[in-house]
Amino acid sequence: MSEEIFPLVNEQGDVVGKATRRECHSGSKLLHPVVHLHIFNTAGELYLQKRSMKKDIQPGKWDTAVGGHVDFGEDIPTALLRETREELGINAEGCELVQMYEFHSDREHELVYAYKIVYDKDITPSEETDGGRFWSMQEINDAIGQGILTP
């Protein structure tokens, strides 16, 4: 299997180059785009997935419902739909872009495209995760600072 290639972007999201996953996650701070999907049910609860213990970044922590990298040559909406199908087996058509922001960590620099959707059907997380469930806002507030959520 060949290594994944990600687009490198400027702060506006324009593609300015490309790099491997390893290069982007090595502390180089190369700005690359990612997609996140926040799934709410009609009760106002937020779905979080539990990251696999096999992940190299934030293993075993509760995270946004869908989060993934944009492949080189792929547009943002296509990446979001692909990641949502891969991780949860659902169709995210009709989701809404909420915000675009930069995320910095000691290992990487991401341009995050954050989307939301209201979804009340069954969700079957892939084996790429260690499960998932809907959380009330009180549960999320109680979990903040406990070391179980991703930043």
Explain the meaning of each model-derived region.
Residues M1-H36, F40-T42:
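Acidic, metal-coordinating catalytic segment for phosphate/diphosphate chemistry
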Residues V15-K18, L48, P151:
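A sequence-level detector of short linear motifs
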Residues E23, G60, F72, Q99-P151:
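Nudix hydrolase/Nudix homology domain
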Residues V34-V66:
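A glycine-rich, hydrophobic loop/mini-helix early in the fold
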Residues A43, M53, P77, R85-D122:
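Active-site segment of metal-dependent pyrophosphate-handling enzymes
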